[in-house]
């Protein structure tokens, strides 16, 4: 089942009057449990473990092609994770593909600790595409990334168990009528902000 429909991260839709289209917004539970990031250990997370964790807790699940996965743990539970992959943009070396905390937890200085550790692994010249539907851009600014530009909202097709970008739908030559008749709902995200770290 798609994590967007789990109790931790519930999908909500709202009508935007100016565009008359359905926008996908993800609701996150408030971060009520505070954990000091300095009391946790930084680990390099195995790709399979990282994928399982992200599939459970991140609205879009695990990305493909991770080169480096770092997490903060107490030895039992991973509370915070950052994953990096080769950048799609040739101007940048690495893309920060996921930056996420365990639902309802606020890991104090968690992202700072992980980004400092990533630099020790030689990660530099980073780009991040921040999905405004569910990510907080101030988290990226807090680790020293700088805003570069915005990307317009993107159309997605969703069911309770799956999601597909409109570009993938067109590439597979699936018509809008086919998607609607098979239970897919067209929604738009809230756009993206591009952040960079040199």
Regions found by a protein language model. Give the residues of each.
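A short acidic, often aromatic-flanked loop/helix-cap motif at beta-alpha or helix-coil junctions
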Residues: 11, 47-51, 155-156
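A short helix-loop-beta-strand connector motif used in the catalytic cores of GNAT acetyltransferases and
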Residues: 61-70, 75
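Short hydrophobic/aromatic beta-strand or adjacent loop that forms the aromatic wall/cage
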Residues: 67, 190-194
């Amino acid at each position: 089942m798609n994590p967007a429909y789990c109790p931790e991260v519930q999908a909500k839709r709202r009508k935007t009057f100016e565009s008359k289209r359905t926008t996908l917004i993800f609701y996150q539970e408030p971060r009520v449990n505070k954990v000091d990031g300095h009391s946790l250990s930084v680990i390099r997370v195995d790709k399979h473990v990282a994928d399982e964790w992200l599939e459970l807790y991140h609205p879009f699940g695990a990305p493909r092609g991770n080169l480096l996965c770092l997490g903060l743990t107490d030895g039992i539970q991973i509370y915070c994770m950052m994953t990096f992959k080769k950048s799609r943009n040739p101007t940048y070396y690495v893309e920060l593909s996921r930056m996420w905390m365990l639902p309802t937890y606020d890991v104090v200085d968690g992202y700072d600790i992980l980004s400092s550790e990533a630099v020790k692994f030689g990660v530099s010249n980073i780009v991040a595409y921040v999905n405004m539907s569910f990510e907080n851009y101030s988290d990226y600014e807090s680790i020293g990334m700088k805003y570069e530009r915005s990307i317009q909202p993107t159309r997605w097709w969703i069911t309770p168990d799956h999601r597909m970008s409109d570009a993938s739908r067109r590439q597979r030559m699936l018509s809008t009528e086919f998607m609607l008749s098979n239970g897919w709902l067209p929604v738009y995200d809230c756009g993206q902000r591009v952040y960079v770290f040199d």
